[in-house]
Amino acid sequence: MRTVCLKLFMVFSLFFPAFWSTFNEDYKMEYYAVFTAAYAALLLYMIFQVWKGKRKKEQRFTLVYLAILILYNGLSLYMNLNYLHWYGEQINNTVAFLFFLVLMAYEDSLGEKEEECIRFFLGCAVLSNVLSIVYYFLGYTAFLICNNHFYFVRLPEDYYEFRHYWIYSHKSDYALMLIGFMAVCIRFRDRFKHRASWFLSMGVFLVALFLSHSWTGFGAAALIFAGAVLDRIDWKKFRFQKIYLLWAGLLAVAGGIAGKLILAERDLLSLGGRREIWSGALKAIRETPTGWGYLFGEALFDATPTWSVNNAHNVFLNAMLRFSVPVGLCFIGMILLIAVYSLVRSRSFLAVGMWIGFFLLLNMDYCLLNYEIGMFLFVIYLVCIYRPKGKEEVWNGMVETKGN
């Protein structure tokens, strides 16, 4: 039953992203998601896991993690009761973070059929993005299911660039998830029956990433591919050869071409005005340390004397801007704790590249909303922490037979 619940979570997350929101207005409803169908499936999974599953021995990480999660909920409840009066973020984030805790704390975390669960996820991720590409060429940008209504979104005809969101709130959210999906495919490349199917799957993700028009996403993708290459090297036997200079030159040429394409659209030195936006956001946070609450999405702060924006274009700054400094710091602490622990557990360059890519995206845009965190954490678990039970696996040059 646990595997079935996880499959339901995948189907809802990747095909039918139904959620309920305080608002129906475009651009605000995603910011104020109260609950999701995917998280209902996660609640069922956690109930069955706690009821039927076998707990691992106590781990220091899970105790520290649980302590920060309890602190996060205590501070969120206080701020909601006294200032913000909106509980959707606290509810959704708690479900997502508890899900990661249960994955960490119990044996057989993927349920009764672990291998089937992984293959099902890989298949769903690829198929979802095949549908995404078809959806784009039909002329649509985003697909949402909110408050029992279907939204088929198109960009304005005179929009300044092409971009694609698929079932996510913004192109940067989509890019973040695509980076995660590619990392999972690299991590479990041996689960594909044929090498051609793996290359085709990666091609689907790269085409989808191109359609998203997230140049930061392509930088993050380069990092995970670099990490994957470094993981394939047997460093004990490594010897420098002149042919490597040729490969380095080809990479430099490819990087130069990519840089020229990006510079034709973006001023990289200005970071798209991010420094001014972040400075303005910090000033707004200092002025309202208890958080904006329902004002977020409507209220503006000054990035420059002649330019105002409605969000910090940064996941961590927005957490403080929206939900107060104490709650935001707890949220940041949770993400950093997960990052450090998963990197220590993975001992792989793939994980390092993935996390650097994640942090690039998380710091450049508001690319992780509460109803997306569950899938984000699931991807991190699969890439960095999960180990096939009783199965030998080559992992960063070492053979492991540990369970998950």
Predicted features, each with a name:
Residues 1-51, 71-79, 358-360:
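N-terminal signal-anchor transmembrane segment
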Residues 134-138, 228-271:
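A membrane-periplasm/extracellular boundary helix in multi-pass inner-membrane enzymes
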